[in-house]
């Protein structure tokens, strides 16, 4: 299998895109797969989609790093760098990124889900950071992104025990945002991606950017960023279309152009 086939990118007619992890058996996140994921994320940044769905297929999301590539400290540095480059690129995709988690999302797979903006879990989904069971720590962003999602105390508990979290608990603690039956997973993910893609996608990208920047700074700086972005969005064609449509036809009827 070529590196190109390890991660597939499909652009849909409605403007959304689907990214499919396609590594044999368990979608082990090898450095080769991560390199291809980085390329795909960079393409989705250079030529944005309306929204992005990341899936590992019907059976699982991703079972974690490719343990066969683990060796000494030099290997760890290279693997960690590959994870950071790829997952940071996923997090930096301008569009909303939706993780459709069908089964196991463990280790690096959980870290990939955490790099997404919204996580939809199948009832069969299982999340976890089990690195402690190998005597190591998460190296793909887990020590930083997991506390930001579930809080520091819960994140520490999950990482120091390595325990697995099923879908219902994942929603309860904020690790997943909603749970659906397995056969409804991609239907729901594509429905949400389609809804976002049919809306004011420039404003969507601005919302994502301002929220992400704001949670990393103090409230005053965040509000200043919001004010600048509020002015910025009023320069878009979509804002003119939306306001005009609201005044003439009421809410929810604007035909946005993405400009």
Where are these regions (language model features)?
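Short strand->helix junction
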Residues: 26-27, 60, 178
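Conserved CoA-thioester-binding segment of acyl-CoA-metabolizing enzymes
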Residues: 1-55, 88
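Terminal peptide-recognition signature
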Residues: 19, 37, 54, 66, ...
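A general structural signal for well-ordered alpha-helical segments in protein cores
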Residues: 34, 54, 67, 83, ...
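Crotonase-fold acyl-CoA enzyme core
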Residues: 91-202, 232, 236, 241-244
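C-terminal alpha-helix plus adjacent terminal tail
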Residues: 1-14, 23, 44-47, 162-168, ...
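Conserved hydrophobic/aromatic "anchor" residues
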Residues: 41, 61, 93, 127, ...
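Glycine- (often His-adjacent) and acidic-residue-rich active-site loop
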Residues: 6, 33-39, 47, 56-89, ...
């Amino acid at each position: 299998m070529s590196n190109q086939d390890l991660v597939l990118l499909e652009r849909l007619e409605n403007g959304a895109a689907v990214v499919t992890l396609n590594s044999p058996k368990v979608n082990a996140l090898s450095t080769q797969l991560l390199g291809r994921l980085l390329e795909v994320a960079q393409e989705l940044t250079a030529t944005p989609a309306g929204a992005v769905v990341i899936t590992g297929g019907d059976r699982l999301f991703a079972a974690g790093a490719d343990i066969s590539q683990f060796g000494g400290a030099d290997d760890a540095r290279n693997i960690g760098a590959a994870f950071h480059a790829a997952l940071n690129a996923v997090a930096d995709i301008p569009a909303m990124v939706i993780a459709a988690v069908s089964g196991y999302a463990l280790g690096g797979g959980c870290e990939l889900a955490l790099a997404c903006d919204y996580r939809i879990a199948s009832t069969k989904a299982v999340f976890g950071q089990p690195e402690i069971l190998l005597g190591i720590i998460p190296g793909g962003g887990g020590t930083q992104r997991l506390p930001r999602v579930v809080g520091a105390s819960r994140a520490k508990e999950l990482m120091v025990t390595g325990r697995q979290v099923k879908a219902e608990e994942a929603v309860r603690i904020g690790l997943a945002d909603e749970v659906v039956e397995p056969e409804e997973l991609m239907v729901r993910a594509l429905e949400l991606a389609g809804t976002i893609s049919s809306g004011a996608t420039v404003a969507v990208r601005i919302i994502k950017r301002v929220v992400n920047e704001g949670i990393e700074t103090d409230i005053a700086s965040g509000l200043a960023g919001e004010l600048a972005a509020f002015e910025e969005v009023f320069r878009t064609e979509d804002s003119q279309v939306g306001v005009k449509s609201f005044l003439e036809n009421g809410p929810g009827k604007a035909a946005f152009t993405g400009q």
